[in-house]
UniProtKB/Swiss-Prot annotation:
The gene is xpt. It comes from Streptococcus equi subsp. equi (strain 4047). The keyword Ribosomal protein does not apply. It catalyses: XMP + diphosphate = xanthine + 5-phospho-alpha-D-ribose 1-diphosphate. SUPFAM superfamilies: PRTase-like (SSF53271). Xanthine binds at L20, T27, K156. This is Xanthine phosphoribosyltransferase.
Length: 193
């Protein structure tokens, strides 16, 4: 997605050899116009797959996920990183390692929000090692639902996440695919959409 790549080049900051800071439009401050376009592109990509729910993990995946759900006209669910006292029965959980934060979290979705009839599109802000999406796939399977696709805003293609998810049999669509960082400069591969 050329618009996203241009925004990364204009407002993204490379930190070290593996981190891209995009807090100007995605991970802290949200550019709703860009997120709306991202949602439209994901919805167009998966329009024929009978998606019934969009799922993400809080927090930075919420903006692109909600706009994708709006474009598909389906509900959006976000997995919580901290258990809420209102989540009492049938909680679906998975352990997820965050590459950026270097911590493992237990993420959860309340029971009853997903069912065996659901065809789920996962949306997330970044794909690095694939553990966040893998955890969501696990939760979706616990509910008996089917993960039919994964939409990624920014993929770090120099890490193994895509291969992990494709090996699980789930289609990955990334709107910006980073080949590498070179002296603070982002180099892209061809995006999926």
């Amino acid at each position: 997605m050329r618009l996203l790549e241009e925004r990364i080049l204009a407002d993204g900051t490379v930190l070290g050899e593996t981190i891209l800071k995009v807090d100007q439009f995605l991970t802290h401050q949200v550019d709703y116009r860009l997120m709306k376009e991202i949602g439209r592109v994901f919805a167009d990509q998966y329009a024929d797959l009978g998606i019934t729910k969009v799922v993400t993990i809080e927090a930075s995946g919420i903006a692109p996920a909600v706009y994708t759900a709006e474009a598909l006209e389906v509900p959006m669910i976000f997995a919580k990183k901290h258990k809420n006292i209102t989540m009492t029965e049938g909680i679906l959980t998975a352990e997820v390692y965050s590459f950026t934060k270097q911590v493992t979290s237990t993420v959860s979705i309340a029971g009853g929000l997903l069912s065996k009839e659901d065809r789920v599109l996962i949306i997330d802000d970044f794909l690095a090692n694939g553990q966040a999406a893998k955890g969501l796939i696990d939760i979706i399977h616990q509910a008996g639902a089917k993960a039919v696709g994964i939409g990624i805003v920014i993929e770090k293609s120099f890490q193994a996440g895509r291969q992990l998810l494709e090996d699980l049999g789930v289609e990955v669509t990334s709107l910006a695919r980073i080949k590498h960082f070179d002296n603070g400069i982002v180099s892209f591969l061809e995006a999926d959409a």
